[in-house]
Amino acid sequence: MIKFKQISYNVTSLERDNSDIKFIIIHDTGNRSKGANAEMHYRYFNSGNRNASADFFVDDKQILQINNYNKHYSWAVGDGKGNYGITNKNSVSVEMCIASDIDYNKMLNNTVQLVKELMKKLNIP
């Protein structure tokens, strides 16, 4: 189940429908610190300007959506000012939490389930 908590920073308002979204971007957080789960990343990104954001954070226990991607786009893609075709405006972003105390295989399975759901919902092959 996806839990939703909208962040207040580092998103840009843009009304778009699902057909505007062509790509799903998957990163890991790069944060191996103990306790660096989805909730902790939400709190970090919702506490001030980070010059970055994402749409989803996934750990071994939950999938946390922190941005309504139909109303805002997140700042997750280094898009080369549009030169490469994949932009923040035409993608949604998924961040995998890789903290040292997270069950990596469960987190990976949760990520796969989320991406499958997004592919179906957004009609992305």
Where are these regions (language model features)?
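Active-site-adjacent loop/helix surface patches within enzyme catalytic domains
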Residues: 1-125
